[in-house]
C-alpha cells in the first residue's frame, strides 16, 4: 500500500484568498490509482513551518506531494524546505539555467536574475520539465529504514500542475498494482443523515466502501471497491452498488459526471423549456445554459414586466411576488409567453420580511407542481438553493411521467 500526503504551500491558500483546487485534483488522481491519501495540509510561505511540515509528512507517508512555492521570489520556499529536510545544498543546474534563459529569449526578453533560483537542484532531485511555465518541478527519492520515500514538488498554477502531474509525475511513480473502481450516485430531497440511516451497515464496511457527501445539488453516495484486477473490483462493487441504488432510487437523479440540469434535459425528452426568474439573479438560467432543451428565459424583478409574462395584478397585490401562486402563474406564463413546451419559474426573496424564502413551479400544460425553499442564509446562498430546488422539482415531476 502506497501512503500519500499532500502539502499545499502559499499564504494566499492559508488565508482563503485562493481556493485550493490543486489538492482536490491530486486527491482524486491518487484515489483513482489506488493510492491511500492520509492527510492534506496547507502551510503559509514560511521556511520553518514548511520544513517542519514536510519532515512530519515524510515520517508518516511514502509519497509527499508539495504544491506551490516554486516561483522565483523570496517567499517561494519549497526548494529551500526540501533541501533542508534532505540535508542537501541546492545548486544551479547548467541545463536548467540554459532552458530558462531560452524561454525568455524565445519571447524576446532577458531572464531576470531573480529567476536563477528556478534552476536549482539538489543531488537527490530530478528536474520535472514544465511545458507551460517557468517553474520546473522536483522529483526527489530518499532511501530510509522504512523503505523509499518520494517527494514531488509541483508549481501552483493549476494548468501547469495538472499537465506536469499527468505527463511527468505519473510515469515515475511506483503505483500500486491494485485496481480501484467507483460509482457516485447523486440524490436530492433527502438529508445526509437520512441517507446514512437508510444505508445502515453499508456505510461501515471497508471494501466495497460506501461514503456520503453533501453537495450543493443534494447528497452524493460514493461506492468504491479495490482488487488485484479491474474485473475483480467490479465484481466486488456490483452487488453493493445495486443495493445502494435500490435503497435510494426514490431520491436519485443521476450518477457520476451527470449534472442535475443534464438530468432535467433528459427527462424533457425533446420538449423545450422556458424559464422565468424573479429575485434569483439568473441563477437557474445559468445552471441550464448549456442544455439544448433550454429554449428561452426572462430574468427580471420589474413588476410591470412580470405582469406581461403572466403574473396577475391580484396575486401581486394579495400574495406578493414571493409566493406560491406567483410562481404558478409565472410557470404557466413561461410556457405561453416564451413559446415553450414546459415552463419553470423561481421567485426569490433576498431582502425584507420574506428574505430567505423562495418558490419554484413547473407547468407542463397537464401538470403543475411547486416547491418551497426556506433558507436564512446570505442572498447568494438563497438564490443558489432556490435554483437547485427548481431543477430538483423539474426532474422529479418529469421523471414521474406527468403524475407528480
Curated annotation (Swiss-Prot):
Superkingdom assignment: Bacteria
InterPro entries: CinA, CinA-like_C, CinA_C, CinA_KH, Competence-induced_CinA, MoaB/Mog-like_dom_sf, MoaB/Mog_dom
Pfam families according to UniProt: CinA (PF02464), CinA_KH (PF18146), MoCF_biosynth (PF00994)
SUPFAM superfamilies xref list: CinA-like (SSF142433), Molybdenum cofactor biosynthesis proteins (SSF53218)
Family: Belongs to the CinA family.
Protein known as: CinA-like protein
Upper lineage: Bacteria, Thermotogati, Deinococcota, Deinococci, Deinococcales
Amino acid at each position: 500500500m502506497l501512503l500519500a500526503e499532500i502539502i499545499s504551500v502559499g499564504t494566499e491558500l492559508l488565508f482563503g484568498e485562493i481556493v485550493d483546487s490543486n489538492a482536490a485534483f491530486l486527491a482524486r488522481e491518487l484515489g483513482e490509482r489506488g493510492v491511500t491519501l492520509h492527510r492534506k495540509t496547507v502551510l503559509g510561505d514560511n521556511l520553518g513551518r514548511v520544513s517542519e511540515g514536510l519532515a512530519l509528512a515524510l515520517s508518516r507517508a511514502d509519497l509527499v506531494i508539495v504544491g506551490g512555492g516554486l516561483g522565483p521570489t523570496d517567499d517561494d520556499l519549497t526548494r529551500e524546505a526540501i533541501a533542508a529536510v534532505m540535508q542537501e545544498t541546492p545548486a544551479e543546474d547548467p541545463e536548467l539555467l540554459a532552458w530558462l534563459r531560452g524561454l525568455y529569449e524565445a519571447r524576446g526578453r532577458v531572464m531576470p536574475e531573480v529567476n536563477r533560483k528556478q534552476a536549482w537542484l539538489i543531488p537527490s532531485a530530478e528536474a520535472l520539465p514544465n511545458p507551460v511555465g517557468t517553474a520546473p518541478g522536483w522529483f526527489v527519492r530518499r532511501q530510509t529504514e522504512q523503505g523509499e520515500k518520494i517527494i514531488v514538488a509541483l508549481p501552483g498554477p493549476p494548468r501547469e500542475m495538472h499537465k506536469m502531474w499527468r505527463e511527468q509525475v505519473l510515469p515515475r511513480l511506483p503505483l500500486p498494482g491494485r485496481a480501484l473502481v467507483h460509482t457516485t450516485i447523486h440524490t436530492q430531497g433527502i438529508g445526509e443523515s437520512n441517507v446514512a440511516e437508510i444505508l445502515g451497515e453499508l456505510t461501515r464496511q471497508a471494501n466495497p466502501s460506501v461514503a456520503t457527501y453533501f453537495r450543493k445539488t443534494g447528497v452524493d453516495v460514493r461506492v468504491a471497491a479495490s482488487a488485484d484486477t479491474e474485473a475483480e473490483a467490479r465484481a466486488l462493487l456490483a452487488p453493493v452498488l445495486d443495493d445502494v441504488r435500490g435503497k435510494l432510487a426514490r431520491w436519485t437523479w443521476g450518477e457520476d459526471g451527470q449534472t442535475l440540469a443534464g438530468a432535467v434535459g433528459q427527462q424533457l425528452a425533446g420538449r423545450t423549456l422556458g424559464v422565468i426568474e424573479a429575485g434569483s439573479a439568473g441563477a437557474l438560467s445559468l445552471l441550464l445554459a448549456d442544455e439544448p432543451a433550454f429554449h428561452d428565459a426572462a430574468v427580471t424583478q420589474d413588476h410591470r414586466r412580470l405582469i406581461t409574462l403572466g403574473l396577475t395584478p391580484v396575486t401581486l397585490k394579495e400574495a406578493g411576488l414571493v409566493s406560491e401562486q406567483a410562481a404558478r402563474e409565472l410557470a404557466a406564463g413561461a410556457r405561453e409567453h416564451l413559446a415553450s413546451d414546459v415552463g419553470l419559474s423561481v421567485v426569490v426573496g433576498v431582502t425584507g420580511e420574506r428574505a430567505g424564502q423562495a418558490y419554484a413551479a413547473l407547468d407542463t400544460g397537464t401538470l403543475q407542481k411547486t416547491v418551497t425553499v426556506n433558507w436564512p442564509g446570505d442572498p447568494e446562498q438563497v438564490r443558489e438553493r432556490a435554483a437547485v430546488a427548481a431543477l430538483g422539482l423539474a426532474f422529479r415531476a418529469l421523471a414521474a411521467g406527468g403524475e407528480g
